Design a protein with these regions (language model features):
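Active-site-adjacent pocket scaffolds in enzyme catalytic domains
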Residues: 69-194
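Metal-dependent polysaccharide deacetylase catalytic core of the NodB/CE4 family, i.e.
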Residues: 1-68, 127-147, 178, 182, ...
Length: 194
């Protein structure tokens, strides 16, 4: 399917590291306890290169998309990610909600046009990468609710949700064909879908 352009396969960093934490030189916990450490960009680079190499060995090509571990992203990781050839990555709408647009305003994820639009993230050194943000509502319904419903009810709810997002875009004067609603699920949720 990937060779025919019907699906795009993504990679993840090897050994599932939380890259933003590895790129930081320490932080203070909510309770005030300080975590002292150096930034480990070489470790991040190693996880990325190893993951890309394994993907290519097994599948015969290098991916351009990435699912970061736990969907954790930060400006500091943009350059290491783009250095290995990644052009886009996926994260969660809660990350978008905590992000600012070019005018410095927090992004309203209740606005379908914001959530269903690929964004550009700028790295600490000026590099850029496209980021898509998963719609948590519909993704979590698939992961945790639809497995307990009849197939007909689950499909009806899914289609109704998509129609609602489409209508929100139309009401805002947007062309739905120019937007991307991202449904993304973690692997540990598969047991809830059967």
């Amino acid at each position: 399917l990937a060779a025919e352009g019907q699906v795009e396969l993504t990679t993840t960093p090897y050994y599932h590291p939380i890259m933003p934490l590895l790129m930081m030189d320490g932080w203070t916990m909510e309770d005030g306890i300080r975590v002292n450490k150096e930034a480990w960009p070489a470790d991040v680079q190693n996880h990325l290169v190893t993951g890309m190499d394994l993907f290519e060995t097994e599948l015969g090509f290098r991916p351009v998309g990435m699912w970061p571990s736990e969907q954790a992203v930060s400006p500091a990781m943009v350059e290491p990610v783009t250095d290995v050839g990644i052009q886009w990555m996926v994260s969660d709408e809660e990350i978008l909600k905590q992000s600012t647009d070019t005018s410095g305003q927090y992004v309203d994820v209740e606005d379908a046009a914001n959530l269903a639009t690929p964004w550009k993230a700028t790295g600490a050194e000026g590099g850029e990468i496209a980021v898509i943000f998963r719609d948590r509502v519909i993704s979590d319904r698939i992961a945790f609710q639809y497995g307990t419903m009849t197939p007909e009810a689950a499909v009806s709810d899914f289609i109704s949700y998509l129609d609602n997002v489409r209508q929100q875009l139309l009401d805002a004067g947007e062309d739905p064909s120019q937007h991307l609603l991202t449904v993304a699920l973690d692997g540990e949720n598969w047991m809830f879908m059967s």
